[in-house]
């Protein structure tokens, strides 16, 4: 294989390489043996057409496209490796020549990884809003949330207040004409919940069971039913019941109802404090990591970040997101229909974050290279075992899905993130 690379501009160039006859000839044989099975030619049994007759009738060149399609991926990868390039986007391939009996010449317009000039990335001083401290108020709020989950709705005498639940019948009309979806019976509505259009719930506050209330509202301009958007409506509303939330007493019995592993309220508070401390420590560490990486990127210089890298990251993120939706039974078409968005909208949404992630990845990879970080066999095996445990898969299955090079890269990058983060201090 002959390989050459000509730089055209920063991070771009043309890779020229050849595919030799030593690879072409056996592939020609394989392709011919495959296609001849489907050829019907008078005087010859199907699948038994001699090569010479095929060449005379169709020309050997008829096989070339299938041959080059089969050989090109591996030949391109080998050429990239031989030229010592780090290609970061899909190449534009052009077959320059496919002469019979000659080596074939291919060119690939490639985008290469930009140079990263590292600045300071160790011992960085960062500011974060997150804190590890857990206050009594936070513990109390967690208990209060659990307490409210055990609350019951009880019939209330007198007028409804914000936070109460009313059971209602309602009939909606516009200019005296009822409309589809504007009627309901024995509907439980939390006042202040925002379940109904703005202004509806507030007009029921102060009214008691047995009362009939004329609720006048205007549908929002962006209301999902276009025929109702922006229109004034009247809802004749009958209140059947008013219910108030009754929360259990704040005592040891409540603590046991919330968590069967504790006996007293003090034990529950101690347990909740420990849980909050653990979660806040994770959040604090994440905030420090994010701030340190951001500062390391700011301190570095990336020489002309190619747009193709950002687009590749956007497409990766979109495919990952839509793949997650599909696992929940929502196809891409269904998602776009439900949300009223397009793939282009998603592209714009992910673009800013994609640029930030791309820059961060480049800087972290440069740090890994500068520090000489590599992955040991033991670290690779542990990474595979951890992934298998995380995704509930067999170790052998994970090993078959991930290339050793990918694992080595990921481990080296983790070490780079660790050296940036662990040496950072919080101002």
From Swiss-Prot:
Stored InterPro entries: PPIase_dom_sf, PPIase_FKBP_dom, Trig_fac, Trigger_fac_C, Trigger_fac_C_sf, Trigger_fac_ribosome-bd_bac, Trigger_fac_ribosome-bd_sf, Trigger_fact/SurA_dom_sf
List keywords of the entry alphabetically.
Cell cycle, Cell division, Chaperone, Cytoplasm, Isomerase, Rotamase
Its EC top class is: isomerase
Q: Name one GO biological process term.
A: 'de novo' cotranslational protein folding
Indicate the segments forming the PPIase FKBP-type domain, all copies: 163-248
Q: What does this protein do?
A: Involved in protein export. Acts as a chaperone by maintaining the newly synthesized protein in an open conformation. Functions as a peptidyl-prolyl cis-trans isomerase.
Q: What is this protein called?
A: Trigger factor
The scientific name of the source species is Streptococcus suis (strain 05ZYH33)
Tell me what gene encodes this: tig
């Amino acid at each position: 294989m002959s390989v050459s690379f000509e730089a055209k501009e920063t991070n771009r160039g043309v890779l020229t390489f050849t595919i030799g006859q030593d690879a072409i000839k056996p592939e020609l044989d394989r392709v011919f043996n495959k296609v001849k099975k489907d050829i019907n030619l008078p005087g010859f049994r199907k699948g038994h057409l001699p090569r010479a007759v095929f060449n005379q009738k169709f020309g050997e060149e008829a096989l070339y496209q299938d041959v080059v399609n089969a050989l090109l991926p591996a030949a391109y990868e080998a050429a990239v490796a031989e030229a010592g390039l780090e290609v970061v986007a899909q190449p534009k391939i052009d077959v320059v020549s496919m002469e019979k009996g000659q080596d074939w010449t291919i060119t690939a317009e490639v985008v290469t990884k930009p140079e990263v000039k590292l600045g300071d990335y160790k011992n960085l001083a960062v500011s974060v809003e997150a804190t590890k401290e857990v206050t009594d108020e936070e513990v109390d709020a967690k208990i209060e949330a659990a307490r409210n989950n055990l609350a019951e709705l009880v019939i209330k005498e007198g007028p409804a207040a914000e936070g109460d639940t009313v059971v209602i019948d309602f009939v909606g009309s516009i200019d005296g004409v009822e409309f589809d979806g504007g009627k309901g019976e024995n509907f439980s509505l939390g006042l202040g919940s925002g379940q109904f259009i703005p202004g509806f719930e507030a007009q029921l506050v102060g009214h008691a069971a047995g009362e009939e209330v004329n609720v006048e509202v205007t549908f929002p301009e962006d209301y999902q039913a276009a025929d109702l958007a922006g229109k004034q409506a009247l809802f004749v509303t009958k209140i059947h019941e008013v219910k108030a939330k009754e929360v259990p007493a704040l005592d040891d019995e409540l603590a046991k109802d919330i968590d069967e592993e504790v006996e007293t309220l003090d034990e529950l508070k101690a347990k909740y404090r420990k849980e909050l401390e653990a979660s806040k420590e994770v959040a604090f560490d994440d905030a420090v990591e994010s701030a340190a990486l951001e500062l390391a990127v700011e301190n570095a210089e990336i020489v002309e970040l190619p747009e193709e890298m950002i687009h590749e990251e956007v497409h990766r993120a979109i495919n990952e997101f839509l793949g997650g939706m599909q696992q929940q039974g929502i196809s891409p078409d269904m998602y776009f229909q439900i949300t009223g968005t397009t793939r282009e909208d998603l592209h714009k949404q992910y673009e800013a974050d994609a640029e930030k992630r791309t820059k961060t990845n480049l800087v972290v990879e440069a740090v890994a290279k500068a520090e000489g970080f590599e992955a040991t066999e033991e670290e690779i095996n542990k990474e595979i075992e951890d992934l298998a445990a995380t995704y509930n898969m067999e170790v052998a299955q994970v090993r078959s899905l991930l290339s050793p090079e990918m694992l080595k890269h990921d481990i080296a990058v983790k070490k780079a993130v660790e050296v940036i983060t662990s040496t950072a201090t919080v101002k």
